[in-house]
Amino acid sequence: MSAGSPAEPRPVPGSVHSVSVSIPDVRSVIGFESGDPATLRRIAWGYPRFRTHPYVARVAALVAGAVGGRAQDLVLTRSVRAAEAAAAYAGLAPGAVFEASGVRGVRVAEDDPALAAVRGHVQHTGAHLTSREAEDVLLEAGLIEARQAEEAVSEEPAEAVRSALATAYGAGDPADVSLHNSGMNAVAAAVAAVTDLQRPAGRRRWIQLGWIFFDTMSLLDKRLFGTDHVTVPDPFDLAALSRVVAAHPGQLAGIIAELPSNPSLRCPDVPALREIADRAGCALVLDATIATPHNVDVLGYADVVCESLTKYATGSADVLMGAAVVGSASPWAAQLREGLRRFGDVPYHRDAARVAARIRDYGDRMKRVNAGAVALAGFLERQSAVRAVSWPYDAASQANYRKVERLSDAPGGLLMVDLRVPLERVYDRLAVAKGPSFGAEFTMASPQIFIAHFDLLSTPEGRAELRSRGLHRDMLRISVGVEDPELIAEVFRDAFDGAG
C-alpha cells in the first residue's frame, strides 16, 4: 500500500504539510488522546485544527517578543476577523487581538480560563494559521532555507478551484462557490450567514439532524453564534423532525445535516428535508464532503452545501481548505453569498494553489475510490469478526442515497465497521496509514470513536451515550483509496486472519 503503517508514529503522507499522523496501535491512540507525555513525545504531529503545526509553533515564538507575550500565550489565526471573533466569544477586550510581522491572533495568558474558549473557537470555526502561510513567514525571517517543493497552480488558483467545483456541483455560476480556510470554516460561515439573515425575523433556533461531526455539533452546543438548537437523534426519523418543526413555529433558522453523517454514515432523505425546511421557512445546510459532488446531486435541494476540500477533492492529505456552494434557487442566495464572505476566511493563496493542482483529478479519483469501496464492503461483510458495515449502500441508507445519486456504484470511500472483536485485534495488525482524517488517495483506517469522542469513552455515562447513538469503542472507520481493490482486500485479509 502506498502509505502503509510504520512501526512508529509519523506524519502521513510525509509532507511537511501533512494533515494526518499514522498511529500504529490502539495503546498509542489512547496515550495520544489522553495526553500521556511519553506518547506525545513520540507523536509530534496531528490534524492541524486539533494540534498546532510545528511551523505555526515556530511563528508564535517568532512574534511573541513583538507583541509582549510568550509563544504559549498566542493563538494565531488566518485573519483579523477570526481573531476578533474568537476574542469576543471568550469575553476578552479588543486589545487581546494583535497583528505583528504579518501575523494575526489573540494574546491570552496560558493560565487564563479564556484561553480554552479562544482555542475552541478557532478550532471549531477552522480559522487557524495554516502551515504554508507559516512556512512563508519563517522563510521571510530566514529561519528556514526553502519552501517544500510541490505541484501547484500559480495562475489564478482560486478561480480554477471555483470553476471545477461549480462544474461538479452543477452550479450556474462560479460566483456561487466561496472558498474557505478549511472545511469547518465553510460550515461555520454557512451557519453564521444563515443565522445572521434569519435573526431579524426572530429565528434563532437550529435543528441538528443526527449525530454529526464533532466540530459541527460544537458550533451549536457551545453557541458560537448565539443560537439555540434542537437535536433530532435519528436522521431517518422524519416524523420526529416534523414534530420538532411544528413545536417551534416561526423560530427556526435552519436545519443542518450531513450526507452521509460522520461517523455513523447514515444518509437522510434529502428531498424530504427540503420539503420540511420549506414548510418551516428555514434554510437547509448540507455537508456532502463524504459523498462528494461527483457522486450525489444535492445542490438543488440545499440553500448551502459545504465541503472539506482537504478530503477527496485533493486526495493528497497535505492541505486544509473548504468550500461552500450556494443553491441558486435559494430565496436567500444573494444574502448567503455575501454572508459567506463576511463570516468566513479566504484561504491562503498557496493553499489554493495546491488544491487547484490536485482538484483536476477529482472526478477520476472518485471513480477509483468508489470501485474500491464497493469491493471492500463486500469483503468485510463476509468476515466473522465483523458485525456490520455502515455505508451509503447498507439497508438503512440505500433508498435515501439512491434518491440523490448521480450514477450507480458511487458510494464514496468511507466505511464504518462494527467489530465483534476488540479493536486492537484488527487495528494493530493493519498495514495501512492509521489516524485522523479521510479522503486521501491512499487507504486509511481510523479508530474514529477514540479520536472524535475520547471524552465520552472515558466514562460509563459517556459510553452509554455513545451506545445510544449506535457507537462504541470497537468500531473501525476505513477511508478507501485508489489502490487496486484486490490489493486493498489482501491487506485487510491479513489483518482479519486470526482476529477471531
Curated annotation (Swiss-Prot):
Pfam families documented for this protein: Cys_Met_Meta_PP (PF01053)
SUPFAM superfamilies (alphabetical): PLP-dependent transferases
Modified residues (N6-(pyridoxal phosphate)lysine): 311
Entry keyword annotation includes Metal-binding: no
Catalytic activity, EC: 4.5.1.-
Catalyzed reaction equations: L-2-amino-4-chloropent-4-enoate = L-propargylglycine + chloride + H(+)
InterPro entries: Cys/Met-Metab_PyrdxlP-dep_enz, PAGG_Syn_BesB, PyrdxlP-dep_Trfase, PyrdxlP-dep_Trfase_major, PyrdxlP-dep_Trfase_small, Trans-sulfuration_enzymes
GO term, biological process aspect, one: L-propargylglycine biosynthetic process
Cofactor: pyridoxal 5'-phosphate
Source domain of life: Bacteria
Protein name per UniProt: L-2-amino-4-chloropent-4-enoate dechlorinase/desaturase
Annotated organism of origin: Streptantibioticus cattleyicolor (strain ATCC 35852 / DSM 46488 / JCM 4925 / NBRC 14057 / NRRL 8057)
Chain's gene name: besB
